[in-house]
Regions:
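Short phosphate-coordinating micro-motif centered on Lys-Gly-acidic
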Residues: 43, 80-82, 86-141
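Hydrophobic anchor at the beta1->P-loop junction of P-loop NTPases
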Residues: 24-26
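Conserved lysine of the Walker
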Residues: 34
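Short beta-strand-centered segment that lines the nucleotide-binding/catalytic pocket of NTP-utilizing
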Residues: 47-62
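N-terminal pre-Walker A segment at the start of P-loop NTPase domains
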Residues: 1-13
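P-loop (Walker A) phosphate-binding loop of NTP-binding proteins
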Residues: 29
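Phosphate-binding P-loop
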Residues: 14-21
Length: 141
């Protein structure tokens, strides 16, 4: 991914897939592009409000999306038990509203989530990003 717009485009692409994920786990260091990817996802869902990382609020719900979007950020939760508990609460709510759940800093979780898609973003030396998508049930893309 050569720049943040390419990262957003990847987010839009994921939502447009016939078998798009209902649970997307994002991993990567600060500045790797996790929130930019969520901006692309939200754009493809018709969400027009600004998308920022919910680092302090921990989660943000966008019920107007098609489908709705729940954006969870586990950055501040250093203990796995707290991250797991919050994730399970948000997952239940997302399921109830038919939403896609996107989790930033998913490496904080210790849960087995076989239905999840996992996207790892990392920095490249040329300033771009490398994205590796793993679909647990269907292998790696």
């Amino acid at each position: 991914l050569k720049d943040l717009e390419a990262t957003r485009a990847l987010g839009r692409y994921l939502v447009q897939q016939p078998e798009r994920p209902s649970l997307l786990l994002l991993e990567g260091t600060l500045g790797a592009g996790k929130t930019s990817l969520v901006q692309g996802i939200a754009s493809a869902m018709g969400i027009n409000e600004p998308i920022t990382s919910p680092t302090f609020a921990l989660s943000q719900h966008y019920p107007q999306g098609k489908p709705p979007l729940v954006h969870l950020d586990l950055y501040r939760l250093e203990q796995q038990a707290a991250a797991n508990e919050l994730f399970l609460q948000e997952e239940e709510e997302a399921l109830g509203m038919g939403a896609m759940l996107v989790v930033e800093w998913a490496e904080r979780l210790s849960l087995q989530l076989p239905e999840a898609w996992r996207l790892k973003l990392s920095h490249r030396n040329d300033g771009g990003r490398l994205a590796r998508l793993t679909r647990s049930k269907a292998g790696t893309c």
